[in-house]
Every structure is written in structure tokens, then in C-alpha cells.
Amino acid sequence: MADMELTPAAVEAEFEWVRHRSPVVVPLINETRDRLGECFGVEVGSVTADAYRDEVGHVFADGTRAVNVAAYVALLRDLDVAGDYPGFVVDEVLGRELAATVAGGQPFALLAQATFHVADVMTHTDGVAGADDLDAALAAGFQTRLPGWEWTEGESAFSVD
């Protein structure tokens, strides 16, 4: 196992990798939104590649969030297990946490973790064990924070003046 050191340059490299992953992540975001919309009987707006890339910029603009997102991304990009052993769940744990970190605070973090599992069953990325969990986590986290869900648009019915 190689050592991993997160430096500002390493975080920037992960930012670029995540940003350029839009051809894979954006269709998965939209497939996930379609599936969730069907389950809940609601229309959910689709996400464009430009909106995704802009939001990646917002996530990585927060240094505290950026260093943690970069660490999860780097770990999942290299994480593998011999024979893709069924009892190996570390990739699932890291994927859920990445989705939550991208999404932000509660309730979005928990919603992103739940959405991770929906996206994960629809994702089959070639490569190491963590590859599909990485794509699913990015899709779940960004779909949660991006506009398109009616309940997140406008004032909450539970706001107190």
C-alpha cells in the first residue's frame, strides 16, 4: 500500500479529476433523480454538465470540505480487494461518507447517504472495487445539493418568523 499525502496540489488534482468526471457522473445523477422521482411520485429537474462542474467548484472552494472530499476520492480511486470479496464493505462506507460530505450538513448529508445506495445499484464501473462506489457517491452527493427538488426551492413551511 502506498502512502497518501494530501497537499494543496493533491487537492487541486482531485478537484480536476472530479470536475472532468462529468460525462460519467451527470448521466448517473439524472438516472438516479428519475428513479427517485418515480418512487416518490414527483418531478425532479435534470442536471447539466455545466451545473455539475460549477457545483464541483463550490464544493472545492471550501478548503475544509475540499481536503476531505479529495481524501475520499483518492482512497476510492485506488481501493481494491482480491477477488472483490463480498464481505468487503469499506468501499461502501467511504462512498456513503463521500456523498454526505459533498452534500453538506443535515438533512442533506443523510439524504445523500441514502441516495448513495440507490445510485450504487445502478453503477458498474470497470476497475478497482472502489470505482463504482466513487461514481455513485459523487452522483448522490451532487444530486442532493443541486437544484431540482421542489421541496428545497423556496421557503420551508416550517420556518419561524
Residue ranges, per PLM feature:
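Acidic, polar-rich N-terminal leader regions of halophilic archaeal proteins
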Residues: 1-161
